[in-house]
Amino acid sequence: MPDRAQVIIRIVPGGGTKTLQQIINQLEYLSRKGKLELQRSARHLDIPVPPDQIRELAQSWVTEAGIYDESQSDDDRQQDLTTHIIVSFPAGTDQTAAYEASREWAAEMFGSGYGGGRYNYLTAYHVDRDHPHLHVVVNRRELLGHGWLKISRRHPQLNYDGLRKKMAEISLRHGIVLDATSRAERGIAERPITYAEHRRLERMQAQKIQFEDTDFDETSPEEDRRDLSQSFDPFRSDPSTGEPDRATRHDKQPLEQHARFQESAGSSIKADARIRVSLESERSAQPSASKIPVIGHFGIETSYVAEASVRKRSGIFGTSRPVTDVAMHTVKRQQRSKRRNDEEAGPSGANRKGLKAAQVDSEANVGEQDTRDDSNKAADPVSASIGTEQPEASPKRPRDRHDGELGGRKRARGNRRDDGRGGT
């Protein structure tokens, strides 16, 4: 007795929709952009849905869910609003019988309350393959309650075995004999192939067929056999002339270019080595090698910096001073040189202005002292002349006004005491 065909009911993984636009896209795909008919549930008298009413129908399903917030981002939505199921029949099954049996099965499972609730659903019947199949999209929100459709192994009615057995029972009434036994009952222990693996195998087979149909034969079979029989020799010569043939000359050109490249690379390494040796000898001859400027990639560098750059370019690494130390040493040396040049050149413009202001202040102090001690100066011209003399102002600190007054008074008292004209 031949084995009977098995019932195939597949819940599409990831086939549920979470947004309004996803529902619209799913229904448009199943209707092939309006070319196929979408039918409502038995509750709606199996009325077909026109293509221009798909958006309106999807909006009503979203409203029935009761949890859809238009302001919420699509990325934040986690609740599946629909479930996608495919009921397949064996190849060669009568298409009318398969359509009627699958529609009756959908009404029994989701529209009659068989599984504990009633749900809205749509169907699309496809015969584009050898085996006819029916797509069923179920609105997961109950019509008369607040529950959600859930198909699982633990559900008493809506489990995988229950779905297949009900499909075999209904199909038998329409003249389609199907087997709903499990794999274990049929003695099959290996893991079944998944739908993703099945689709991958289909794509690989299609690519293989396309590859075999492509014509890559551009040469004669005799030339192919001759080319395969000869081993590759880059220096093969033409037996008739004794000279390398045209293909051989073309093959030798890359080899010659490679040899010239290696020769130029070796000469570059030798040149870098010569530069490094000359720099080291120059550094040993000079007591301060850092004072020898060498033009580099970033301006004027010291010999140490140039040597470091040469070492880096030539791939030679030794125990020479780090470039950072040389740079810090150069900066400090420039600062000391600038400070020494400033001292030799004299005070700057700001310092000259400060000295001039100090001299003017000193002259004002002298004039005030002359006014206060005018009588003493008139009596003693020598003391007056001494009083008018002022020491040279220091460039670092100007004379204080009170210091000048006290010095003049002391000198005046000292002069009077020496002349015997007063003083205690």
UniProtKB/Swiss-Prot annotation:
EC number: 3.1.-.-
Biased composition (Acidic residues): 212-221
Composition-biased stretches (Basic residues): 330-339
Basic and acidic residues bias locations: 243-261, 394-408, 415-424
Annotated S-S bridges: none
Stretch list, region Disordered: 206-269, 321-424
Pfam families (UniProt xref): Relaxase
InterPro entries: Endonuclease_MobA/VirD2, VirD2
Keywords attached to this entry: Crown gall tumor, Endonuclease, Hydrolase, Nuclease, Plasmid
GO molecular function terms listed in the Swiss-Prot or TrEMBL record: DNA endonuclease activity
GO biological process annotation, one example: symbiont-mediated induction of tumor or growth in host
Function: Tumor formation by A.tumefaciens involves the transfer and integration of a defined segment (T-DNA) of Ti plasmid DNA into the plant nuclear genome. The virD operon encodes a site-specific endonuclease that cleaves at a unique site within both 24 bp direct repeats flanking the T-DNA.
This protein's name: T-DNA border endonuclease VirD2
